[in-house]
Amino acid sequence: FFRIPVPMGVAGWCFLQVEVSFLAYLSTEASMNDDVFTTVDPDALNMDNLRHLADINGVGTSYYGWTGGHEEVGATSLLKVLHAMGVDVKPGSSDEDINRAITATEDAPWLRTLPATTVVRKGDWRDLWVHVNDGESVRCWYVLEDGTGGDLQQLDRPVPPRDVQGQLRGRATFEIPGTLPTGYHTVFAEIEGREPVSAPLYIVPQKITPSRLSGPQRYWGVNAQAYSVASRTGWGVGDAWDLADLSAICAQEGADFLLINPLHASETVKGMENSPYRPVSRAWLNVTYIRPEAVPEYATLPNRQRHQIEQAREQLMEEIADEDQIHRDPSWQAKSKALRWIFQQPRSTHREAEFNAFCLAGGIEQERHALWSALTESVGSTDLPKEYRSATSEATQKFAEEHSADIEYHKWLQWIVSEQLAWPNSVAKKLGMQIGIMADLAVGTHPLGSDYWSMPGVFASGMYVGAPPDMYSQLGQNWTQPPWIPSKLAETGYEPFRQVIRAALKLAGALRIDHILGLFRLWWLPEGETAAAGTYVYFDHEAMVGILLLEAERNDAILIGEDLGTVEPWVRTYLGERGILGTSVFWFEKEEGTDLPLHAD
């Protein structure tokens, strides 16, 4: 049994920062939603049909408010959310539009030969529906990660064909055997006379049982904000070197883990975001945690340049010596000049090979993050001019051709920070910590960040994530983070989600998932509206949690879900059954009927 105390004061401070940032963002020209909506008169629509359309698209039509009352979601909110998900309706749509959208939604799976992504628990036998033109024969097989495979057996499950856009479509049912091993596999379907089509088939653990939780041990640890742990030898903001030192101190004191804030990427232009819970990307790391002097190529710099770097560091420390606040901007401005010099130094043969391998593994996703970083530095803002707001625009591609060295520099920064941020967990393990670094996963990303810029089709334009009204915030909360569209995420094979989990787990022995309820449902609210105008959008939690477990199992990592707040009772039970630990506020844990702290048992 494992619980983590949550400092409420810090949480309150984080919400304050989010609200201030939101107001600043609304003043920019970079609106994510250019549509002009009209108000809907619910009396003019068949609400039963609209609610049905919402239901089959995973959009909540009602919820229980903080007072316990049953709240109905209005027509305007439902139509705006559905529109943002790619459903062909919007405020002002007619009943005929809604009926057409219902038909299109119900036809969609019949138009696909294979489901977008199939996620199955290991040991479960699952039906796989394959759709073909009526009367066509089809063969299905699977290929495992290791290259081996086998045929899938077709079951005798006749289903009446469906008329889809004037074409009769049939359904064949195949069986996915429960004997398949866990992993990211592929299923294939071959219709007579056509090229085979494929789709992801993921077999995930029923439950994770990390080796460190196999016995009766009880663990304790320390919670620290990495950026605040700044040493006299650093650059005014805590970095990987400082975090490794803190990790060593905690290990020597007998701690089993060190819980830190999210290490997701931030912008590298002036006006850097203070909150680590509003990153520009969750798939990449925060390069401000680099310690320049610890980069191997630093030692090859001419003495003059090393002296200049040390002088710049000392001057920075003198300027902020009497300050109680954390100065990210001046720290990074001084540090980045040093890193530019180090980047230009020749690398040894093996170091160059390692860097090239890192870039190759990063693929197009790393290329785009580096391009976005170079663009924002060139412009001096994350609010890019219109011609650069698309990763594939002509202007963006021209910039990429003309600034290849800057793009390579930002790839190099990611390589260096990934090396250095691996130190704290390595030190912890060497010195006897049972768990090591406990990483933290933020809920989402900045609307002007590289994740949204790189993959706009996966995000819901014109929507933000937040929380419904409650006793403390009767207008609700707006976290100003664009959400993923569930169906679009599935069409990618959940690749963006997999990247985020992998990035966090490669640096840690455990992972805390902030607002883990977001794997089940998220409160969406339209841009420009209060949170009270929102509704819940549901995700395929079996797929999301299953992928999370598969990545954790491969790293023998512990998972902790931050499950505070309004939670449906079955959710905590479900998480526990899958091996994900929960969170409690320490100060509120009392023996029943007393003011005594909860007993250790």
Language model: regions and residue ranges:
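Short, Lys/Arg-enriched N-terminal segments with co-localized hydrophobic residues
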Residues: 16-31
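Acidic/aromatic-lined carbohydrate-recognition and catalytic surfaces
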Residues: 83-154, 158-190, 200-455
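Aromatic- and carboxylate-enriched substrate-binding clefts and catalytic-loop regions
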Residues: 264-265, 269-285, 518-539, 564
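Active-site-adjacent "subsite" loops/lids of carbohydrate-active enzymes
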Residues: 288, 447-495
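Active-site-proximal helices and loops of the catalytic beta/alpha 8
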Residues: 425, 429, 444, 448-470, ...
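An active-site-proximal structural segment forming one wall of the substrate-binding cleft
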Residues: 427, 496-511
